[in-house]
Design a protein with these regions (language model features):
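Bacterial Sec-pathway N-terminal export signals of envelope proteins
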Residues: 18-63, 67, 73, 216, ...
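Short segments within alpha-helical structural elements
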Residues: 42, 189-214, 376-434
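Small/polar, glycine/serine/threonine/aspartate-rich low-complexity segments that form flexible
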Residues: 65-98, 226-235, 269, 282-318, ...
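Membrane-embedded beta-strand positions in outer-membrane beta-barrel channels/transporters
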Residues: 93-95, 139, 244, 313-315, ...
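Periplasmic alpha-helical coiled-coil/stalk elements that build and connect Gram-negative outer-membrane
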Residues: 130-246, 361, 365, 407
Length: 438
């Protein structure tokens, strides 16, 4: 209960002490701090390392080896007799090898690693898009909650003035006690509605705050967007076919699928590389030192110099038969390629369904907005006329409250329809490759 009260105080404090957050700021913050996105970024970095490893496979390797050995005991001498002796030897070698031809395996692995990095980058962008849409949805709910609360406050203000007016009229004997009681009940209901809308608004802001993973001590409130009703009504909805065509060229999930399809083609080429011979160039530098007890031999430095040796060679490996492993690897790579083709078609189908649903939702939202706009204008005019009749004693308090409630309900319905339509239009622009904003 204490936390609820504190939260209410934070949200109800004047905006001068609040940090005002726009939708763009919320999205940027979420993208920067979301844990899942940061994990996805780590995966992209791993793909970058894999690409570096694939590129470095064409470089020569270099290794250094050293060996020191000792032996003790009886051994055969040069005059064919046995005697106790000890020997020790030292060997040093520097060797290198470089691939000259591997059936284009290295080149195709580089292409595949680059494709996997590009696919991971697009998948990261898709994850960012998901966050953008989620933040926009919660932000819009918070905006709607703000506007609904303002409408409820207006209702409380109207009912408060009307209640006070009737009380004064009752004292003057110009109003019935029953009318005052009904108006006081209407005021109590208006205050209850305001309490509920404030609770819903706080809940929406809290949900947005939790999505952004904001720290508890960070002040937070949203900036209310401003929209012209005529401009909103004049917005044109593009065709579903146009939206889908644009989405096919812009959406990261489509780009990622196409890149993965290309990567699977490289995988077939990598498997086929095992059919070709492999040629390596190798080279080495080495020297050694040897000493036997009882025999006079050159010193360490002289032996190391005199025993210095160099070597160069070519290594050719020609595959003949490996128990059909290469054949099966090629077949498996082709099956994976076919699976990726099906996955690509499924991704396109899912995108088509999404676009159709967004288009239908937008058309419906526009129809609701247009109808709500007419209903709002009509209810405002009806309230104006009823209010004039009531003030002239030609309408009852019940008729006045009914007209007032109809007007305020139409305003609430218009707010909901307006923001739903704005959100759906923003989604259409987003599917067409534009920034998500409203």
């Amino acid at each position: 209960m204490k936390k609820t009260i504190i939260l209410g105080m934070i949200i109800c404090v004047p905006s001068i002490s609040m940090a005002q957050w726009s939708l763009e700021r919320c999205i940027d913050y979420a993208i920067t701090h979301n844990i899942q996105l940061r994990q996805q970024e780590n995966n992209t970095q791993l793909k970058e390392l894999s690409l570096s490893t694939a590129r470095n496979a064409s470089l020569p390797d270099l290794s250094f080896g050293a060996q020191e050995s000792f032996s003790f005991g009886r051994g055969l001498t040069a005059d064919n007799t046995y005697t106790n002796k000890s020997t020790n030897s030292t060997a040093l070698q520097l060797s290198t090898s470089v691939p000259l031809f591997t059936g284009m395996e290295i080149q195709n692995r580089i292409k595949q690693a680059k494709a996997e990095l590009d696919a991971a980058t697009e998948e990261l962008e898709k994850a960012r898009n998901d966050i953008r849409v989620e933040v926009a949805k919660y932000y819009m709910q918070a905006v709607y909650g703000h506007e609904l609360t303002e409408t409820a406050r207006r209702q409380v203000g109207i009912d408060s003035l009307q209640t006070e007016r009737l009380r004064q009229m009752l004292k003057a004997g110009k109003a019935a006690a029953a009318d005052v009681a009904r108006q006081e009940a209407a005021l109590a209901q208006s205050r209850l509605t305001l309490t509920q809308t404030e609770t819903d608004m706080r809940s929406a802001i809290l949900s947005l705050r939790l999505l952004l993973e904001l720290q508890d001590d960070k002040a937070f409130d949203i900036i209310m967007p401003k929209h012209d009703y005529d401009k909103i009504a004049g917005m044109t909805i593009p065709s579903a076919e146009f939206i889908y065509e644009q989405a096919l060229t812009q959406r990261p999930e489509i780009k990622s699928g196409m890149i993965k399809l290309k990567s699977s083609e490289y995988n077939i080429s990598i498997a086929k590389a095992a059919l070709y011979p492999k040629l390596y160039l190798s080279g080495s530098l080495g020297t050694n030192y040897y000493k036997t007890s009882g025999i006079e031999m050159d010193g360490f430095g002289k032996q190391m110099k005199n025993n210095f040796n160099q070597g160069i060679g070519l290594s050719l490996s020609i595959p003949i038969f490996n128990r059909f492993q290469t054949r099966n690897n090629i077949r498996a790579a082709r099956v994976e390629h076919l699976s990726q083709q099906l996955s690509m078609e499924n991704t396109k189908k899912a995108l088509y369904n999404e676009v159709q649903q967004v288009y239908l939702n937008t058309v419906s939202a526009k129809a609701r907005y247009t109808s709500s706009l007419v209903a709002r204008d009509s209810s405002e005019e009806a309230f104006r006329l009823t209010k004039a009749k009531y003030e002239n004693g030609k309408a009852s308090i019940t008729e006045f409250n009914e007209a007032k409630n109809d007007m305020l309900k139409s305003e609430s319905d218009l707010s909901r329809a307006k923001y739903e339509y704005i959100y759906q239009m923003a989604l259409i622009d987003f599917y067409c490759g534009k920034d998500l904003k409203f």
